[in-house]
Structure formats: C-alpha cells, structure tokens
Amino acid sequence: MFIVVEGIDGCGKSTVASLLAAEIGKKRPVFHTFEPGHVRDGLYRELIMENVDNPFVVAALFTIDRAEHVKKMIKPALAKGEWVVCERYADSTLAYQGYGMGLDKELINRMNEEAIDGLWPDKIFYLDIEPHLALARLQNKEKDALEGQGLEFLQRVREGYEEIARTRGYIYMDATLPPEIIVKRILEEVKLQ
C-alpha cells in the first residue's frame, strides 16, 4: 500500500504522517518518507531554495528528486512488501509550481509522468486547512523560501489542490482536527488489519 499525505504548508502533514507510520508499523512493515530531499540529504532542497524565484528550475529539481526517490526508495520498499507513507508527491509540484507560481501545468504533468514511472499512490489523503490558519501554525517555525511566500500564494496553492483533488480522488481530511483523530480516520480508510 502506497499512501501519500498532501496539503499546503502548515496543514500538519509531517505530524500526521509520522503518527500514521507509527500506527501502521505496529501491524506491518512500513517505510515513512518525504519529498523533497529524502534521497540526497537535502541537496536538491538547497538548490531549490537558491532558485525559488524560478518556477521551472524548482519544478525540474523537484521532479529529479522525485525520480530518484521513486526508483531508489519507494519502489524497493513496496517490492519488499512494506507499506509506504510519503509526505508530498507529484501533486505538490503541480499545486505549488503550477497553481501557486504559474508554471505550465501540462509541462509539470509531463515531467511528473516521467519521474514517477507509472507509480501512483493507492490512497492520497489531503489535509485541508484555510491558508490563514496554516500561516498561524507556521508563525513559530523557521520558514524556508517556499513557506515564506505568504497568504495569497497559499490560497492559490490550496485552490490548485482542490482542482487536482477532483480528478485524482483525494480523500479529504479536516486538518483542524487533532492529528490523532485524522490518523484514526486514515487507518479506517486504508483498512489496516
């Protein structure tokens, strides 16, 4: 089972994914991962932050990172029978660089198709939250250049996620709920036995 947790910055992806992986790990092998930067210890993330004002460079770096991530980490984990819980995947690039920054969405889709090599998640859980609430959560957190884009940017990204969700069959989760409740609902959806 390949599970992805998506949502705008400040929605609680990392907290939910960590708790989810811990719960799954009680019953079966699980691999908890994230994008970007899990493959090369943040090399791409550093390059991305240096080029944050160029959506094409950012999208290209994300998809290069994703291609390595899929090939070297996600597919091998799935082949071993592990469940994979991933924070962000292909749709993050579409939402952030396509809807948020205005890069051509078809170009991003083509890049993602190559990067993921046909591997789509079994379930995508979208942690939905109003952008102003997400920004309030990020107040005390050190923000990177993408997280510091502001309210209007996050509104565009959220609108993008909502449009993507209609075609991809996301399972909506109210990100204002306690993380433990969200995880319980996700576990019900994936029917962990």
UniProtKB/Swiss-Prot annotation:
PANTHER family: THYMIDYLATE KINASE, UMP-CMP KINASE 2, MITOCHONDRIAL
The entry's keywords: ATP-binding, Kinase, Nucleotide biosynthesis, Nucleotide-binding, Transferase
Gene: tmk
Domain of life according to the entry: Bacteria
NCBIfam families, per the entry: DTMP_kinase
Function: Phosphorylation of dTMP to form dTDP in both de novo and salvage pathways of dTTP synthesis.
A cellular component term, taken from the record's GO annotations: cytosol
MF terms in GO: ATP binding; dTMP kinase activity
GO biological process: dTDP biosynthetic process; dTTP biosynthetic process; dUDP biosynthetic process
Enzymatic reactions: dTMP + ATP = dTDP + ADP
Residues noted as binding ATP in the record, renumbered to the chain: G7, I8, D9, G10, C11, G12, K13, S14
Gene3D superfamilies membership: P-loop containing nucleotide triphosphate hydrolases
The protein's name: Thymidylate kinase
Stretches that traverse the bilayer: none
The protein's Enzyme Commission number: 2.7.4.9
Keyword presence, Nucleus: no
Pfam family, one: Thymidylate_kin
